[in-house]
Curated annotation (Swiss-Prot):
Catalyzes the condensation of (S)-aspartate-beta-semialdehyde [(S)-ASA] and pyruvate to 4-hydroxy-tetrahydrodipicolinate (HTPA). Pathway: Amino-acid biosynthesis; L-lysine biosynthesis via DAP pathway; (S)-tetrahydrodipicolinate from L-aspartate: step 3/4. GO terms for cellular component: cytosol. This is 4-hydroxy-tetrahydrodipicolinate synthase. The gene is dapA. GO terms for biological process: diaminopimelate biosynthetic process; lysine biosynthetic process via diaminopimelate. It comes from the Bacteria. The active site is at Y136, K164. Its EC number is 4.3.3.7. Keywords: Amino-acid biosynthesis, Cytoplasm, Diaminopimelate biosynthesis, Lyase, Lysine biosynthesis, Schiff base. InterPro entries: Aldolase_TIM (IPR013785), DapA (IPR005263), DapA-like (IPR002220), Schiff_base-form_aldolases_AS (IPR020625), Schiff_base-form_aldolases_CS (IPR020624). It is found in: Cytoplasm. Pyruvate binds at T47, I206. The lineage of its organism: Bacteria, Bacillati, Bacillota, Bacilli, Bacillales.
Length: 293
């Protein structure tokens, strides 16, 4: 299943005064992302502040993105949690909305399942889901790492179509790519590892930086696929300071700051996250301005 090369892990626009998910701002952001290099969108993922969105807010968000998208980009809904039964129920509900192409299921966090538990969790969700499942391995947040052997086993299940790999372990990612079928999609979950993962056979990136430099991310990937490796490497090096700067404080505060500065109004982050202070904002803006020099 081809979900695209550059998939943006979309921030969730919040009205700054009402502290509510904002329909008008969602519409503006989705159009901006599609026009600027996004093949697909992940909605209500980590970057979308899913832990601080209510169930009803997520449904509202999904409905508005589906309506605005109108079939242009691939849409992936974040429906995972650390409760298997709730994940299944929510995934089934989202499938009834129509317009979603897949779901992103995060590794269960806090309760620390072992590898057998992780396999059983994803297998149960995949069996129950009417939508294709993308695994989300992010041990820095979930505490547990989905080992390559577990992902390779899961990749054999017919409804599991890919993985967003945010472990940062290139050896493990290489093993997954080598031992899964060609139609199993392996995406970098870290912007800075996009090019290295492409080099070992990956399919693309689920990106944060593409909010700001989506066309440049596309250019890097396309250059690599044309065999212009040096050009791709040059673009990678040019974008690297911004990729790192977007995680200088907890995500997605830096991305929301830059979007707001550029006139793409997405509002603040929600507590317990906090927005950038003046010094942090100035440093980040300087990094962005340095890209054009």
């Amino acid at each position: 299943m081809d979900l695209g090369k550059v998939i943006t892990a979309m921030v969730t626009p919040i009205h700054p005064e009402k502290d509510k998910v904002c329909k008008k701002r969602i519409h503006h952001l989705v159009n901006h992302l599609i026009k600027n290099g996004s093949d697909g969108l992940v909605i209500a993922g980590t970057t979308g502040e899913s832990p601080t969105l209510s169930h009803d807010e997520k449904i509202k968000l999904f409905r508005q993105v589906i309506e605005t998208n109108d079939g242009r980009a691939k849409l992936i809904a974040g429906t995972g949690s650390n409760n298997t039964a709730e994940t299944i129920a929510f995934t089934k509900e989202v499938a009834t909305l129509g317009g979603m192409d897949a779901v992103l299921i995060v590794a269960p966090y806090y309760n620390k399942p072992n590898q057998d538990g992780l396999y059983a969790h994803f297998a149960a969700v995949a069996e129950a889901s009417d939508l294709p499942v993308v695994i989300y391995n992010i041990p820095g947040r979930s505490v547990v790492n989905i080992e390559p052997e577990t992902i390779i086993r899961l990749a054999k299940l017919p409804n599991i179509v890919g993985v967003k790999e945010s472990s940062g372990n290139l050896d493990n990612i290489s093993k997954i790519i080598a031992e899964t079928s060609d139609d199993f999609q392996v995406y970098s979950g870290d912007d800075s590892l996009t090019l290295p993962i492409l080099a070992v056979g990956g399919n693309g990136v689920i990106s944060v930086a593409s909010h700001i430099v989506g066309n440049e991310m596309q250019e890097m990937i396309q250059a690599f696929e044309r065999g212009e490796v040096q050009k791709a490497a040059q673009i990678h090096r040019e974008l690297l300071p911004l990729m790192n700067g977007l995680f200088s404080v907890p995500n997605p505060a830096p991305t929301k700051y830059l979007l707001n500065q550029q006139g793409i109004s997405v509002g603040p982050v929600r507590l317990p996250l906090v927005d950038l202070n003046a010094e942090q904002g100035t440093k980040l803006q300087a990094i962005l301005e340095g890209l054009s020099k």
